[in-house]
Regions:
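N-terminal periplasmic accessory domains that precede
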Residues: 64-65, 86-90, 103-107, 119-122, ...
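Membrane-embedded beta-barrel scaffold of Gram-negative outer-membrane proteins
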Residues: 283-287, 293-307, 462, 468-476, ...
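Extracytoplasmic beta-strand/coil segments of soluble accessory domains associated
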Residues: 65-110
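Transmembrane beta-barrel wall of Gram-negative outer-membrane proteins
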Residues: 178-249, 271-293, 332, 336-340, ...
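Gram-negative outer-membrane beta-barrel transporters
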Residues: 168, 338, 397-401, 412, ...
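Surface-exposed extracellular loop regions of Gram-negative outer-membrane beta-barrel proteins
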Residues: 245-247, 251-259, 352-373, 414-438, ...
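Short acidic/polar hinge/loop motifs at secondary-structure boundaries
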Residues: 110-138
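Flexible loop and strand-edge segments within Gram-negative outer membrane beta-barrel domains
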Residues: 211-214, 228, 232-281, 300-323, ...
Length: 694
């Protein structure tokens, strides 16, 4: 195996590439900030990972998983290419069984994360993204919450007085010849004027999946507008529509994986998600003559979802969800002192999130039945959630080689849950209860409020040119989401408390030679009142606050080696020690979903004729349940591709994923009942992608 990998590495050595801008004047440049603060790379006070367009668009990516999985300590999982998605950052896996929690999501300065902490990662399509940055670990003083960090998405810049259109078409195998091929067609046009730019794009995807019930499809429309006024203000607007459906295949046992990996128990219940999202937003930015930099954004959102199977025993049920809300973000900053030795910068941010979510769950899916047949309702609940956040930052820099940052934030969150759930021991009141008439119902109105002081301190020191040390300590929190509202065992409201977290990290960045750069980080985080999955008496998966805490510690390493002007190698890896606290029922056991080791090698090479890439990734043994009695075997995956430059600004990419035909589960079902832990990933697949710029 080692010789085979080495041979592949030599053949497919690959390099860095990025989207080429024309030679015309660019109206703007994307600036990546660390902890809301502009900083030279050498003086960033914590772990910040930046991913360029080449990594985001490579290997026929349908989402950000390829890009994010190349970051140490990060694991993005999907059920089928383009299906359900979840994101784990430094051990935050247990709060993300079906979605993205514990990680704040920003899109060109707009807050996409909702007030309950859920982040709609399905909105982010690679064809919309120029670059991204990820801050790992607790950083609530900077971003308002989420002990898993913050993900910042940046879209392409506009080009002055130029029009650029593009088309991207893609087709690939799924690993199951009986189901057909997956397809993508996306196109857009960017129009740049003297003082404004407009971008319109549309994306359509369809994937029949590898397993018999693993299909997904989506249609997405996007609009961006930017205007530069004569007074120096920058006005940005965005709007978009997302219409996506994805099947929920359901986890299976190891015996089924060995004999029929395409088996999908969810097919028997029509288990799937149908999601609609609409967003619209406005942002204003300006730098004043006094030196103040000001930015504010307002984003409105609407969503609806239908979900046959609900959260009940044996996967039966039908759930409907609708929600609306908005996010407001404003910040101002200025260098308030600059001397010969020291400089002092000040920044302040205010954020408000407000969302209303209505969820109804029925005993079974509505159907074309005769009038008069009533389908029993399990619950009918509305959650109103708000977050208010204010934070100030003070940054002192000495001689451009030493920096200390202090941030203090205050967060106030409230959520009110009202509506009906099944009741027990009370009097039936059919006239006042909208629930089914043959059971008792209970009216609820529950309010929870949390106020948290959020400090952060960080420092960095460039001890010699190219060699920097950094350290920081910071806090975080995570509130219960709408998904965790109801206990599936008895249908009652789960009165969960907010999680709190504290994290520390320290590390080094070193430019060993002109060609070699390394980064090393050691971290430790603790989480109190952790919200974890527990298995109920009816085998349903529920959530509960666990006393005793969680401990997440680990080591992360990155190495970049530029072999020549064409060839670049990047290696990364992490070693984790994530476990339950000593006062928990599972003291000392490893946290499910956190591989003990992970890493990979990326080889890239640019030539006049095109680009070649090789991506290897290894995931070590992964615990699957709280008791530590079940472990998923380690696995390695290798992807390879070749891109060829064609006339008329066209490019053709040919590639294969999982070329060694590794057998593994891309989505382990943590704490799965009856041994149902596995969602098998596709075997070897191939794809063809064509991009055309006009």
């Amino acid at each position: 195996m080692g010789k085979y990998l080495l041979t592949l590495a030599v053949i497919f050595t690959a390099g860095h590439s990025s989207i080429n801008l024309s030679a015309q004047t660019v109206l703007e440049t994307v600036q990546v900030e660390a902890y809301r603060l502009s900083s030279p790379e050498a003086l960033i006070t914590g772990a910040l990972h930046i991913v360029d367009s080449a990594s985001i668009h490579s290997f026929a990516a349908s989402d950000l998983s390829t890009a994010l999985n190349g970051i140490p300590g990060v694991k993005m999982e999907t059920r089928g290419d383009g299906g359900s998605r979840r994101l784990h950052v430094r051990g935050s896996a247990l709060r993300s069984p079906y979605s993205v929690r514990n990680t704040m999501l920003y899109y060109d300065g707009f807050v996409l994360t909702e007030a309950d902490g859920n982040s709609p990662l399905e909105w982010i399509d690679p064809d919309l993204v120029q670059s991204l940055s990820l801050v790992s670990g607790p950083a609530a003083a900077s971003f308002g919450g989420a002990y898993g960090g913050a993900l910042n998405i940046y879209t392409p810049s506009f080009t002055k007085s130029a029009t650029h259109a593009w088309v991207h078409s893609q087709a690939g195998t799924t690993g199951n010849n009986d189901l057909g091929i997956n397809t993508r067609i996306s196109s857009g046009v960017d129009i740049g004027f003297e003082n404004m730019g407009v971008s319109i794009s549309a994306i359509m995807t369809d994937n029949p999946g590898y397993r018999t019930w693993e299909w997904n499809n989506k249609t997405q429309l996007n609009l961006r507008f930017k205007y530069f006024d004569k007074a120096g203000g920058i006005h940005s607007m965005l709007a978009g529509h997302f219409d996506g459906d994805w099947a929920l295949p359901g986890a299976i046992k190891q015996s089924q994986v060995d004999t029929l990996p395409t088996a999908s128990p969810g097919a028997d219940y029509n288990a799937h998600v149908a999601r609609l999202r609409d967003i619209a937003g406005y942002k204003f930015e300006k730098t004043f003559n006094s030196g103040w930099e000001f930015s504010t954004s307002l984003l409105g959102r609407f969503t609806s979802k239908t979900n046959p199977y609900g959260t009940s025993q044996f996967y039966k049920g039908y759930k409907e969800e609708s929600g609306s809300g908005y996010s407001l973000l404003a910040s101002a900053g200025k260098r308030i002192y600059e001397g010969n030795v020291w400089s002092l910068d000040f920044e302040m941010t205010v954020m408000h999130l407000d969302d209303k979510i209505h969820i109804t769950e029925l005993e079974s899916e509505p159907s074309e039945l005769p009038t008069g047949i009533i389908i029993p309702m399990r619950y009918d609940l509305t959650m109103n959630a708000q977050q208010n956040f204010v934070s100030t930052s003070w940054v002192a820099t000495r001689l451009n080689n030493f920096r200390i940052e202090g941030q203090i934030g205050l967060s106030n969150r409230s959520r009110t849950i009202s509506g009906w759930t099944p009741g027990y021991g009370g009097l039936r009141n059919r006239s006042s209860s909208p629930l089914y008439s043959d059971n008792v119902s209970t009216l609820h109105s529950i309010k929870k409020t949390h106020s948290t002081i959020l400090p952060r301190i960080g420092l960095s020191w460039e001890v010699a040119p190219g060699y920097s040390l950094f350290a920081q300590a910071s806090t975080g929190f995570s509130d219960p989401t709408a998904f965790e509202l109801v206990n599936p065992e008895d249908g009652q409201i789960s009165e969960l408390d907010s999680e709190s977290a504290f994290g520390m990290e320290m590390g080094i960045r070193a430019q060993l030679y002109d060609q070699v750069k390394i980064g090393f980080t050691a971290y430790q985080s603790s989480v109190n009142s952790a919200i974890l999955q527990v298995v109920q008496e009816n085998d349903a998966i529920a959530f509960a606050n666990i006393d005793g805490g969680l401990i997440m510690s680990g080591l992360e390493l990155e190495i970049d080696y530029i072999i020549s002007d064409q060839i670049n190698i990047r290696a990364y890896g992490s070693q984790t020690l994530h476990h339950f606290g000593e006062e928990t029922d599972h003291a000392g056991n490893s946290l499910p979903g956190s591989p003990r080791t992970s890493g990979g090698v990326q080889l890239n090479s640019n030539y006049s004729w095109g680009t070649a890439r090789l991506n290897t990734r290894h995931i070590g043994e992964t615990p699957l349940n709280n008791e530590g009695s079940s472990v998923m075997d380690a696995y390695s995956v290798i992807d390879a591709s070749v891109s060829i430059n064609l006339p008329y600004d066209m490019s053709l990419e040919l590639g294969a994923r999982n070329i060694l035909d590794a057998e593994y589960s891309a989505w382990p079902q943590l704490n799965g009942v009856y041994g149902k832990f596995y969602n098998p990933a596709p075997p070897r697949t191939a794809y063809l992608s064509i991009r055309w710029g006009i």
